[in-house]
Amino acid sequence: MTTEIISFNLGVTSCYFIIGKEIVMIDAGMPNKLQRFKKILSKNKIDPARIKLIVLTHSHFDHCGSASEIRDLTGAKIAIHKSERECVEHDRVLVPKGVNFRGKITQPLIFSFKIPFPKFTPDIFLNNDPYPLSEFGIDGQIIHTPGHTIGSVSVILNSGEAFVGCMAHNGFPFRLKPGLPIYAQDIGAIKENWKVLIDRGTTFVYPGHGKAFPIEVIKNQLKYPSTN
């Protein structure tokens, strides 16, 4: 199956359309971004009804802030890992630690902000088993990749693209160049999950913040930790 990838920003967050027979959207950006989202649809000549699934890589407000409004517009189902259900239905925030110098310095400031977003009940609760995307005409699956948060997930395509949320950063204020995240609940788990993605043939990384980059960046950081 042939797929097309469209990247766009909703606030500081990098979101993506994976276009097959239908469209799967990765992350829903900051709160109050519905009008910008409509402009993105218009610019790319996308019928909102083609978007059938919104995959939330995790429950932080900058990744799920406009999910409820976008679901209302498109009729798409929202999928999130079951361990983060409370975070989007209520007001629980999973706070990761700073894992390098920049992360430790900025973490208290970044996570002192608690921007409200419309709470919602997701339609699909992912577990630790892969969730295939074949019903949308896309050769790929959603897999559980905990580390940034306990319920973080990634979307991997058979063609080598990996949409990883905050398993990687590539943009201000997080990193000035691509690489491993500067915040994580368990950086060891992130590194192990990167090994899984590499073993599964990942060639290109689509992060939750910043532009896509080749997997060689991550391979080098795993091999030479001092470069992180």
PLM segments and residue spans:
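Short, hinge-like loop/turn segments at secondary-structure boundaries
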Residues: L94-V99, P181, K223-P225
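Short acidic-hydrophobic surface loop/beta-edge motif
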Residues: F8, I18, D129-F136
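Active-site HxH/HxHxD metal-binding segment of metal-dependent hydrolases
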Residues: S42-F125
